[in-house]
Curated annotation (Swiss-Prot):
It is an enzyme of class 1 (oxidoreductase). Keywords: Antibiotic biosynthesis, Iron, Oxidoreductase, Vitamin C. InterPro entries: IPNS-like_FE2OG_OXY (IPR044861), IPNS-like_sf (IPR027443), Iron_ascorbate_oxido_reductase (IPR050231), Oxoglu/Fe-dep_dioxygenase_dom (IPR005123). It comes from Amycolatopsis lactamdurans (Nocardia lactamdurans). PANTHER family: 2-OXOGLUTARATE (2OG) AND FE(II)-DEPENDENT OXYGENASE SUPERFAMILY PROTEIN-RELATED. Residues 154-267 form the Fe2OG dioxygenase domain. Belongs to the iron/ascorbate-dependent oxidoreductase family. It holds the Pfam family 2OG-FeII_Oxy. Pathway: Antibiotic biosynthesis; cephalosporin C biosynthesis. This is Deacetoxycephalosporin C hydroxylase. One of its GO terms (molecular function) is deacetoxycephalosporin-C hydroxylase activity. Coiled coil: none annotated. Signal peptide: none annotated. One of its GO terms (biological process) is antibiotic biosynthetic process.
Amino acid sequence: MSDKTVPVFSMAELRDGSRQDEFREWARRGVFYLTGYGATERDHRVATDTAMDFFAQGTAEEKQAVTTKVPTMRRGYSALEAESTAQVTNTGTYTDYSMSYSMGIGGNLFPSKEFESVWTDYFDSLYRAAQETARLVLTAAGTYDGEDLDTLLDCDPVLRLRYFPEVPEHRAAEYEPRRMAPHYDLSIITFIHQTPCANGFVSLQAEVDGEMVSLPHVEDAVVVLCGAIAPLVTQGAVPAPNHHVVSPDASMLKGSDRTSSVFFLRPSTDFTFSVPDARKYGLDVSLDMEKATFGDWIGTNYVTMHAVTS
């Protein structure tokens, strides 16, 4: 693992171009931290607490009522170990050691009106911030050749709160090195706001210059990771870094729980791309066609993710 440090930019710096050369360098690596983007620590805490209360207090019946029956959509509650990123990426069959709640623009499954109000406001603030950030990232590289940016950024985003419980002994690093498999996101960009593990363990890592780099919690900041759409619209200049969530070893299980609030700025489902170009840029697209839509791609992944083997 590398000891490289990923820089922190403020939205004000990105807007005024005061660190433009450095920002362009890190946009071309596909990962950086961002502060001053609109949402506050209180916004994150209220939304996280709302979901965590439901995880802890919701009955089995209440959780079942907000568990989607549509395998191609991320909506509502997903139980602990109900998904496997490893299956999607063909890196194993182990499950994601987390539970989650997800929402989007429509088709949502809210546990209560209060939950809906808190999460809708949170979603809207992150959507605005992610749109502005994506515009700055995609134009920084100087190679943008996608459709009109306003059209691309009229998106079908997903907001997901993941809770990674304290790691049990059988999922310690000695037995299973990861809580979540290496993957890149199917998004334009992704915001990740994380809470730190109480014991100081850093779980999130991303690939930078061919090495995995730790991404610890930074106060008032989100991690920005560029997703698979970025290389498709920048002639490969902006990558989609692989990232994963690693497991602590047996000596650091206590206090290893954490949360991760993830906003995927996904294009509309009718966004069309060249499958050969995607493969040229290192993306694993198994669809047997020359041109595909984002809806074709994402739907296949979600079905595979939920086909958890026992």
